Amino acid sequence: SRIVQSAVAKGSTLYNGKKYKEAAQKFELVYALSKKDTSFLENAALASFYAKNYDQSITLYKKLLSIGYTGITTQYKATNALSGEDMYFNSQKDMDNQVRLKLAAAPEVLVSESRTGNIAKNIALSYIAKGDQDAALKAIDDAKKIFPNDYTLIISEANIYFKLGDNKKFLELLKKAIELKPNDAQ
């Protein structure tokens, strides 16, 4: 619908202009008007985080997890037989027809990775930003079940333990982070 398209355009413009609070509201509106557009709920959560509205960010990220959102997308890509440029199709059937007619070649089905781990990590980072160490540690623990060797999660967890004065746990996690990325000075 026109209203949805207008809200998407306005939200994107606001986001690109670093007006995150307003962008989050527009992206939430898109989701409210079109529940199938769940990626806009993720956009709203991220914009809320950047707007330092951490409670809203946490609420939206948790909602994404509760509705089973993964963020996995599938793209159908082939090379235009005449121009050699990449072409994207709405469906496998459309792509296959173009290949069969020899209008396209080298078909590929591209499937993105799940966003679930990033969502769990962003919940933890929102709690850290709020200063809620206990909730952050629980969220990190949940996220590590999905991504046990995520460098950012390990560093975030180490920093919390440092703030809590648990130097033993801090050093243990730092050692693990160094093993994962020996050349990272973070």
Regions from the PLM with identified roles:
Residues 1-31:
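Post-signal peptide N-terminal segment of secreted/secretory-pathway proteins
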Residues 4, 37-39, 72, 116-117, ...:
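Helix-start (N-cap) detector for alpha-helical repeat units in TPR-like alpha-solenoids
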Residues 30, 64, 143, 176-177:
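Canonical positions in the second alpha-helix
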